[in-house]
Amino acid sequence: MPEISLRHVVSGSSQDSTHCAENLLKADTYRKWRAATAGEKTISVVLQLEKEEQIHSIDIGNDGSAFVEVLVTRSAGGGGATAIEQDYEVLLVTSSFMSPSESRSGSNPNRVRMFGPDKLVRAAAEKRWDRVKIVCSQPYSKDSPYGLSFVRFHSPPDKDEAETPSQKGTVTKLGQFRVKEEDDGASSLKPGALFFSRINKTSSASARGPAGPSYAAATLQASNATSSASSVSKALGSSCKPQESPKGKRKLDLNLEDRRPASKPSAGPPTLKRPKLTVPSRSPAAAAASTPAQKAAPGKPREGTEPRGARAGPQELGKILQGVVVVLSGFQNPFRSELRDKALELGAKYRPDWTPDSTHLICAFANTPKYSQVLGLGGRIVRKEWVLDCYRLRRRLPSRRYLMAGLGSSSEDEEDDSPGESGEDEAPKLSRKRPQAKAKTQAAGPSSPQRPPTPKETKSPSPEPQDNSDTEGEQSEGQDNGAEDSGDTEDELRRVAEQREQRQPPAPGENGEDPYAGSTDENTDNEASTEADLPIPELPDFFQGKHFFLYGEFPGDERRKLIRYVTAFNGELEDYMSERVQFVITAQEWDPIFEEALMENPSLAFVRPRWIYSCNEKQKLLPHQLYGVVPQA
C-alpha cells in the first residue's frame, strides 16, 4: 500500500520546543511530537496532505497518550485553516493506547497500532480527503507531557497488489523496523473487552468437538507411554531404568501432549547424559547401597534416583530459596543489583537492613558494619558464591559450605538441604576423600604433625570394609557439625579424651618389661600381612573447598608446615593471587597492597599462620576473624 505524503502542519494546540509538531512530517527520523507542558488533558494537530487521497489504513506510534482520535476534512470545504469542528468527520474513533494503570505507572508508552480498513469508519474511508486532524488525550496522568512518535497514512493498494496476496499486508516496514500488523480478531483495549473475550473463549471451547480425556484417562495414557519407553530403554542399559519412570510421572501434569508420542526413546539422550556426570563419581559402596533402596521404595523416585539436573527444573526456579530472607553487605553496583536480582529470582526475599525475620547475610568481606551487627546477633553470614552456585546449578545448596561466620546448627543445615540431595552430594564427597586422605598421610611421612597411626588407633574403625565409605562419611559429617555448632559438647570431650589416650604410647617399663630387652629380629610374613591390612586413619577435611595463598616471608620452616597442614586438611594452595583465593596467610603486618587486593576481590581474608596451627590443634575449623590482619590505627 503506497504511503500518503504529508505537506505541512496547518495548526497545533500545543507543542514542545524540542518535540514540535513538524517532527511528524519527517519519515526517517521518528522524532516525537509532545505537548508543551504536562497535565494537558487534550492536544491536537492538523496536517495537510499533498493532495486529496482516500485513506485506506493508518499506522500510529504512541508516546504516552491514553487515547487517539483521527478526523478528516477538505481544505476547500470553506473551513480553511480555521475550520470549525462540524466540518470534520470521524475517520478513526477514539482508540485506546494505554490503560489507566499503564498511564499511572508510565509503562508501555510507545505502543504501535495499525488500523486497517475494517477499523476505520466506512463512510469516511470511502471518500477522499486532504486534511487530517489528530486528537490525543491523557486523563489519567499529569506527570509528564505526551504526544505521538509517528503517524503514517496509506492509500488503497493497486489492483495488481490486491489480486496477488503478498506478505506486505501482515508485516510493514517502517524505516529500519518491521511492524507486524494486528490480527483482525484482536480485541482493542476497551472497557469490558477482556471480560467479553473470556466469555467467548469459554463458550467456543465448550462448543467444540468431543471433550478431551479425563484425568484418570490421561494418567493411564501417560503410564502406557512410560512403560513403552522403558521397554525400549532396556536395550540401552540397565542404568537408565531408575531415571526413566520418575520422569514420566513428573511430567504428566506439565506437558502431557509432548509425552504421548514418546513411544520411541526420545527422552533417552537427556536422561542418559545427566547420569554420566554423577555415576562415575560415586563410590562402589554408595552405588551398591542405593540400588536396594531404589528397589525397596519404588514409590519415591525423588530420593536419589533422579538426575540432579532434573530435580529443580526451570518451573521450580522461583522456589529454590523460598523462605530465605537475605541482606547484602559490602557490594557495589552493578554487581549488587545483579546479586539481588538473582536471589529474588530464586524465590528469596530481600531486606536492605538486618531485621528479625532475616535469615542470611551475604557479605563481601569481613569487618563491615552489618557483619559486626549480625555476628553479634548470632545470624548466619555466607559468601556470595552461595547464591551464584544455587543460581548456576538451579538447586538449593547447603549454606554451611559457604559460611563466613555465624550460626551453623544442624537444624538450619537440614533446611538448606532439599530432600534427596544429601545422598547424591555425599557420594561424590566420599569417593574424592578416600584416595586424597591416603595420599596425604603417605606424603606427610613420619615427621607429619598429624597424629600417627598407632596400632590401637587403627583397630578403632569398623571391621566391615564394604560399609567403610558410609561410616567415614558419617564421621566427617559429625566433625563438620561439631565444628559449627555448640551441641554435643560432652560427646565431643569424651571423643577427644579417647583420642588422646590412644595417641599416648605406653610408658617404658609400664608392663614390667625392659624396653631394651626386645628382639631385634625382622617381622615374619604373618606380622607384615596383618600390619598391611590395617586401614589408614582418615584426616579431617575442614579446609575442603577453601583456597589459600602464602604471602611474604616466613621464619624457619614455617612455610613448609603451613603447606603441609593446608594440604593435609584438604585445602587448596594457589601459586599466585587469583580470583579463587579466599584466605591470604601472612606473617607480616598490614600492607598497602592488601587494600588493592580487597578492591579487586572484596571476599579476601588476611589471616596469620596461628589460625592454621589452632585449627590443627583443635582438629576443627575455627573462626578466622580472631586471627585476622587488620590495618594499624
From Swiss-Prot:
Residue pairs linked by disulfide bridges in the UniProt entry: none
Location of Phosphoserine modifications: 144, 203, 230, 245, 263, 372, 409-411, 447-448, 462, 486, 519
Cross-link Glycyl lysine isopeptide (Lys-Gly) (interchain with G-Cter in SUMO1) residue location(s): 180
SUPFAM superfamilies cross-referenced by the UniProt entry: BRCT domain, Galactose-binding domain-like
Predominant place of localization: nucleus
Signal peptide residues on this chain, from the entry's feature table: none
One GO MF term: damaged DNA binding
Keyword list, A-Z: Chromosome, DNA damage, DNA repair, Isopeptide bond, Nucleus, Phosphoprotein, Repeat, Ubl conjugation
Ranges of biased composition (kind: Basic and acidic residues): 244-261, 300-309, 492-503
Domain BRCT: 316-404, 538-629
Comp. bias (Low complexity): 280-298
A Gene Ontology biological process term: single strand break repair
GO annotation, cellular component aspect: chromosome; nucleus
Modified how: Phosphorylation of Ser-372 causes dimer dissociation. Phosphorylation by CK2 promotes interaction with APTX and APLF.
Compartmental location: Nucleus; Chromosome
Composition-biased stretches (Acidic residues): 411-425, 467-491
Phenotypic consequence of residue 102 to K: In a mutant cell line defective in DNA repair
Function: Scaffold protein involved in DNA single-strand break repair by mediating the assembly of DNA break repair protein complexes. Negatively regulates ADP-ribosyltransferase activity of PARP1 during base-excision repair in order to prevent excessive PARP1 activity. Recognizes and binds poly-ADP-ribose chains: specifically binds auto-poly-ADP-ribosylated PARP1, limiting its activity.
Name the record gives this protein: DNA repair protein XRCC1
Organism: Cricetulus griseus
Gene: XRCC1
